């Protein structure tokens, strides 16, 4: 048995010990790629057709979208993760982020249109404010729709004018 001499001058170089990322770090990276693959699987058809993917990955994602059995779905998602490790995920993530940004913007516009519709029906002065903001809107038609919507609400009729006001507001917001 060799004994270590405590008086010996041992040099410790911390750079020579580093073997790369830890096992846990590698697992986190693999899981992140699988999550990115899951986002691809959950994309609506129109967005999935527009996203640029390597052919093998596109086929694997398309197959995963058709699978309903849990164990097969899990295996296919792991396979997608394996394919993702062989490519650069940054462009795919950028495209997904762009889709999400568009969706968030569209949602915000729809919420704003809903708020305008509710304000217009509840408050007569809101019409003046709306027409100042969107002067190209047909004021006569909008006034008539507001009257009809109030009448429909009072009589518990289907909200036909209510929906039409929303369409008019959305068109005005897109034009302006």
Swiss-Prot record:
It comes from the Bacteria. Pfam families: DarP (PF04751). Gene3D superfamilies: PSPTO4464-like domains. Residues 1-29 are annotated as: Disordered. Residues 1-16 have a biased composition (Acidic residues). GO terms for molecular function: ribosome binding; rRNA binding. GO terms for cellular component: cytosol. Its main location: cytoplasm. Transmembrane segments: none annotated. Member of a network of 50S ribosomal subunit biogenesis factors which assembles along the 30S-50S interface, preventing incorrect 23S rRNA structures from forming. Promotes peptidyl transferase center (PTC) maturation. PANTHER family: UPF0307 PROTEIN YJGA. HAMAP family: DarP. This is Dual-action ribosomal maturation protein DarP. It comes from Thiobacillus denitrificans (strain ATCC 25259 / T1). The lineage of its organism: Bacteria, Pseudomonadati, Pseudomonadota, Betaproteobacteria, Nitrosomonadales.
């Amino acid at each position: 048995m060799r004994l270590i001499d405590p008086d010996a001058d041992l040099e410790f170089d911390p750079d020579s010990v580093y073997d790369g990322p830890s096992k846990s770090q590698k697992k986190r990276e693999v899981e992140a790629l699988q999550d990115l693959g899951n986002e691809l699987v959950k994309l609506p058809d129109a967005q999935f057709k527009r996203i640029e993917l390597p052919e093998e990955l596109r086929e694997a994602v398309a197959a995963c979208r058709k699978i309903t059995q849990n164990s097969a779905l899990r295996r296919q998602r792991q396979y997608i993760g394996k394919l993702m490790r062989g490519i650069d995920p940054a462009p795919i993530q950028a495209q997904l982020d762009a889709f999400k940004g568009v969706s968030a913007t569209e949602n915000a516009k729809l919420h704003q249109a809903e708020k305008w519709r509710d304000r217009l029906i509840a408050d007569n002065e809101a019409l003046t404010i709306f027409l100042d903001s969107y002067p190209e809107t047909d004021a006569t038609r909008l006034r008539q729709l507001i009257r009809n919507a109030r009448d429909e609400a009072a009589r518990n009729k289907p909200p036909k004018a209510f929906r039409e006001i929303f369409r008019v507001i959305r068109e005005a917001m897109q034009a302006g």
